[in-house]
């Protein structure tokens, strides 16, 4: 069952965007430095999905740095190293104080694809009353915390 949807933000420092331009559509990302997050289990970079009018596009962004530490990516982006994709709850303090600026903001029809988080059990019979209570507790606490 779906536990939560994690909104994402594509962002970079104002200085980086002033020097390199602000992308308006996914194809504009090709000339930018990408700060990519990778899966710790197999090293694959996470895809940068964008949505517009019900269509999904994977942005092609050349990586200048790939790591599995989202806080490091936020710090690198704030220092002007490139454009990154951050969970909104990670990006929010940087956006609020101006260290980062959203790339695909309200003035564009493109939106970063959210990540869906699921609660899984191996068999329906394993979804006992205690497990259901845990699921409901997590759903009530996590979903609002991840909305920004």
Residue ranges: model-predicted function:
Residues 1-2, 26-27, 56-57, 92, ...:
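Short secondary-structure boundary/capping segments
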């Amino acid at each position: 069952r779906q536990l939560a949807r994690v909104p994402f933000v594509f962002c970079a420092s104002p200085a980086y965007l002033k020097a390199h331009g602000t992308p308006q559509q996914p194809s504009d990302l090709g000339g930018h430095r990408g700060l990519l997050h990778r899966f710790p289990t197999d090293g694959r970079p996470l895809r940068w999905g964008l949505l517009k009018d019900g269509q999904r596009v994977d942005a092609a962004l050349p990586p200048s740095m790939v790591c599995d530490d989202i806080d490091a990516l936020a710090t690198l982006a704030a220092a002007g190293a490139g454009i990154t994709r951050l969970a909104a709850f990670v990006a929010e303090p940087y956006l609020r104080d101006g260290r980062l600026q959203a790339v695909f903001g309200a003035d564009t029809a493109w939106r970063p694809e959210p990540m869906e988080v699921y609660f899984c059990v191996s068999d329906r019979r394993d979804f006992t009353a205690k497990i259901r209570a845990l699921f409901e507790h997590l759903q009530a606490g996590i979903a609002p915390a991840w909305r920004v």
